[in-house]
Amino acid sequence: VPMEAPSLLDLPTDRIQESDLADVLWRDPSGIDILLAPPRVEMAEMVTVRDLEKTLSLLRRVYEVVIVDTPAVVNDINLAFLDASDTILEVVTYDSTTIHSTMVMADAFRMIGYAPTKVRYLVNRVDSTGGFDPEVLVRALGRVPEHSVSSGGQLVVRTNNEGIPFVLADASAQDVRDRHARVG
């Protein structure tokens, strides 16, 4: 992502229109439009829940699918996104800290009143259990995770460092073929 790429802060949130999106979205090499978070952490305080709700509403009108990547904390901003979501996809790995955090979030989601069908789980690096019994995760979630992806090994690390989506870097790689098979 170029350092000078526009971000959410560049939107005229008081009067946002569809035409404003073209000025603030960054298109990645795969053709996905991305609305970036503010470039510095302290600038995030300038964004209000109302700004995000208006922006998300507009994005949902323009795009068939809107993915919001939030940090693993519960605050007013993230709750606004979670409440507005059709589906929450929580990414988990086979390590005790992540599993504990996932259990805490699952309890929070239940207390908030989210239907179990709203929350889905994706096990990242499913082939790298690190000696962890996968059944522990199933017990912690109270169900089998709906999705999983393998680690991707060196291809993922190399292309991430190069800023290239790994699915575009080597179409013949097994991990890429696996992912294409999952999405059809």
Language model features with spans:
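Phosphate-binding loop that captures ATP/GTP phosphates
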Residues: V1-I34, E45
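Phosphate-binding/switch loop-helix module in NTP-utilizing enzymes
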Residues: A37-N78
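Inter-motif core of Ras-like GTPase G domains
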Residues: L58-R61, V74-S96
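G-domain G4 guanine-recognition motif of GTPases
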Residues: V92-T93, V119-G131, S148-Q154
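Conserved C-terminal guanine-recognition region of P-loop GTPase G domains, centered on the G4
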Residues: T102-K118
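Beta-strand-loop-alpha "switch" segments that mediate conformational coupling across diverse proteins
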Residues: R125, V138-V167
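NTP-binding/hydrolysis catalytic cores, primarily Walker-type P-loop NTPases
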Residues: N161-G184
